[in-house]
Amino acid sequence: AASDVYKRQVYDYDVLRQRLREMAFLTKNLRIILTDKRPGQERTETFHYEGGIKEFVQYLNKSKEALYENVIYCEGERDGVYVEVAMQHNDSYNESTFSFVNNITTPEGGTHLAGFRNALTKTFNSYAKANKLVKENEAALSGEDIREGLTAIISVKISEPQFEGQTKQKLGNSEARGAVDSVVSEQLTYFLEQNPTVAKTICEKSLLAQRAREAARKARDLVQRKTVLSGSGLPGKLADCSDNDPAKCEIFLVEGDSAGGTAKQGRD
């Protein structure tokens, strides 16, 4: 009997509350009532969200400052896959993206998440280039730069979901990628065209992230360069160059304790 295996059945109210709230967010207008009748722990909570996953994003962003007021929302159906996506950037540097299939969380992502990220990167780069928000000599925005400070919910409904991985927490349906990519690309493009101020705000944040990442890379390369030189056993009077172009690099061999400083000052 079950009672022989599970000697004591204890329900964790906080775990139940989190999951039921999540389900209410994922199914707009669904009303869920959670009641605890255990002596000394009596309480009741109702979960009902008319805005669905748009309110989910606002809930996740409540402790942060959103960069724009309205949550971006995309909805549609392609090839039998129903797609819902909500997103909003905040002033943080971290990405918080959560994906679901038939209201089941997919912690390892999968094809629906891949489709979303591809659409996001493609659409923002197209918009930035068309509206000259990115200079001709600047590299395209990376997905990582665009997703900095992004909170997003990706929810798809599929009749026969296929899960991959040892823990079955990753969606494998190939049609989900195309469906999400198509719906998000089309509707996000329209949103950006209709909301140029929001579009510019997101692109500017992405460009800052790109420049910060590039500056960090250069600083890291410089440290590694110095580390290699200092660990090579070369004499201290051998000063490394700071230019990455080999044609502009040179080595000065100098005599005396103070000559190194004046020699380096004479470099062009």
Report residues per predicted region.
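GHKL-family ATPase ATP-binding module
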Residues: A1-D268
